[in-house]
């Protein structure tokens, strides 16, 4: 009798995706982040669902309802801080996952790569709207500043902003719709994840060498299931350490003050995972230019397959490209730091230089170095 997992219509799909899936024998720990992102999404959906049971999306009661969750609901504080810090861990995994794709040339699977970038945009939008929900000072002013950027769009800008707000300022209508979108988007993300996996399994996984691995495949289970469990345990350890020892480490103290439209905080800044993009936005004095740079800072990832001029797929055997890649990583750390600093000398000029370097490395320096490496190898 044939094994049920190979014949049952539903179990067969799971089998081909997670059990009998042929995987390259040499994929490193950098390939663990896909499963970790799946875990993060599940954690966020479940903690978010339980938070939504107690949260009220009204300007008068939103802040109080979050306080109520933390004080009166059984383990409410745990659910709330797991959700807030879960977002941070989610973004750490996202950045590492994208960085891995850039380093090892995984972007040559361009359907998988482009859906991944759409996923990145969707997660960023979800996180932004989630940050508005507690209705603290930084929630309110963050929402005001970021939505206001759309007013830079010529002709339709102002109308568009008022349409998103549902009025003439960020108010009850804005909070209600942000809650609705924040609730529904993770399920859309989950559907997109399935499409992402569908396209990935059409081609199979890349591997550190960037070479075709068809001649040397091993089953996903037990080898990579065990490897993923190690990653899962480490992720849970990091998340729970953050939640139980310093839950407010990555948050903003201003968000413990209820939203007040009449009092602007001295430094409006988003959560840490948006700071690099925020620094790029602020480094351009023109409003429309800043908005374009902000969008392009992520959208530029879609150009990676077109900018790949090297004869080799991975950076594993390309030391010059490796060097530039790590300079890009250092540049992103610099931008993240600058995004959290006040707009004054010397931070302004450092931010501008770091922003120029970011686009220069991706659009100019990396492709040029790829051509130089081809020449050095007489290809």
UniProtKB/Swiss-Prot annotation:
Heme b b562 binds at residues 83, 182. Keywords: Electron transport, Heme, Iron, Membrane, Metal-binding, Mitochondrion, Mitochondrion inner membrane, Respiratory chain, Transmembrane, Transmembrane helix, Transport, Ubiquinone. It is a multi-pass membrane protein. InterPro entries: Cyt_b/b6_C, Cyt_b/b6_C_sf, Cyt_b/b6_N, Cytb/b6-like_sf, Cytochrome_b, Cytochrome_b_C_euk/bac, Cytochrome_b_N_euk/bac, Di-haem_cyt_TM. The keyword rRNA processing does not apply. The chain crosses the membrane at residues 33-53, 77-98, 113-133, 178-198, 226-246, 288-308, 320-340, 347-367. GO terms for cellular component: mitochondrial inner membrane; respiratory chain complex III. A ubiquinone binds at residue 201. Heme b b566 binds at residues 97, 196. SUPFAM superfamilies: a domain/subunit of cytochrome bc1 complex (Ubiquinol-cytochrome c reductase), Transmembrane di-heme cytochromes. One of its GO terms (biological process) is mitochondrial electron transport, ubiquinol to cytochrome c. The keyword Lipid metabolism does not apply. Binds 2 heme b groups non-covalently. One of its GO terms (molecular function) is ubiquinol-cytochrome-c reductase activity. It is found in: Mitochondrion inner membrane. It comes from the Eukaryota. The cytochrome bc1 complex contains 11 subunits: 3 respiratory subunits (MT-CYB, CYC1 and UQCRFS1), 2 core proteins (UQCRC1 and UQCRC2) and 6 low-molecular weight proteins (UQCRH/QCR6, UQCRB/QCR7, UQCRQ/QCR8, UQCR10/QCR9, UQCR11/QCR10 and a cleavage product of UQCRFS1). This cytochrome bc1 complex then forms a dimer. Component of the ubiquinol-cytochrome c reductase complex (complex III or cytochrome b-c1 complex) that is part of the mitochondrial respiratory chain. The b-c1 complex mediates electron transfer from ubiquinol to cytochrome c. Contributes to the generation of a proton gradient across the mitochondrial membrane that is then used for ATP synthesis. Belongs to the cytochrome b family. Heme 1 (or BL or b562) is low-potential and absorbs at about 562 nm, and heme 2 (or BH or b566) is high-potential and absorbs at about 566 nm. This is Cytochrome b. It comes from Marmota caligata (Hoary marmot).
